[in-house]
């Protein structure tokens, strides 16, 4: 049986609810313990929630610029199911994720993909491995190293080596 844990809140760091969330909670009541809501979760606690999941679903309906939730989930070794939005296809460009279109049937596509991944644990395992490797490209250490390298390349005549920066 598939269970759904909805993590987070519509307003970062706040406990207030949106009309959408209230409606979602009302609909979920009919499903009993199959759907749970955590409310707001601090960022430093998120890895615990990612590791609870067999799959992390990021069904954004807006243009998601960075898709950090997807990158964080991959970093925790979780396969990702997301909507094709903003920068998401750039981050999720390979075998680590399933992307669905944001069209009139997004709920149907998500449902199909969740069931398909539920029924194929071997595919989830492959996606997890690929995702963990992909997430390394987006680590803060990697961004720092790339930034230092760019600064050094741009103004290299000012320093002897990147380590002197």
Regions found by a protein language model. Give the residues of each.
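Nucleotide-activated donor-binding/catalytic signature segment of Leloir-type glycosyltransferases, i.e.
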Residues: 8, 17-40
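Short hydrophobic beta-strand element within catalytic cores of glycosyltransferases
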Residues: 79-82, 99
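Short alpha-helical donor nucleotide-sugar binding micro-motif in glycosyltransferases
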Residues: 40, 49-53
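C-terminal alpha-helical cap of glycosyltransferases
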Residues: 140-165
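A short alpha->beta transition loop at the rim of the catalytic pocket in nucleotide-sugar-dependent
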Residues: 54, 77
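A short, well-ordered alpha-helix in the C-terminal region of glycosyltransferases
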Residues: 116, 123-137, 149
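A short hydrophobic beta-strand element within the catalytic core of glycosyltransferases
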Residues: 56-58
């Amino acid at each position: 049986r598939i269970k759904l844990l909805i993590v987070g809140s519509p307003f970062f760091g706040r406990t207030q609810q949106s009309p959408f969330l209230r409606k979602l909670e009302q609909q979920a009541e009919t499903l009993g313990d199959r759907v749970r809501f955590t409310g707001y979760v601090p960022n430093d606690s998120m890895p615990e929630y990612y590791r609870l999941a067999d799959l992390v679903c990021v069904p954004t309906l807006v243009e998601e610029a960075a898709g950090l939730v997807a990158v964080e989930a991959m970093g925790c070794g979780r396969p990702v199911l997301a909507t094709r939005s903003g920068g998401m296809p750039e981050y999720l460009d390979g075998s680590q994720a399933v992307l669905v279109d944001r069209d009139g049937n997004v709920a149907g596509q998500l449902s199909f993909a969740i069931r398909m991944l539920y029924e194929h644990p071997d595919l989830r395992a492959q996606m997890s491995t690929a995702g963990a490797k992909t997430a390394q490209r987006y680590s803060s250490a990697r961004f720092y190293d790339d930034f230092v390298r760019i600064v050094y390349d741009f103004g290299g005549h000012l320093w002897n080596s990147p380590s002197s920066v």
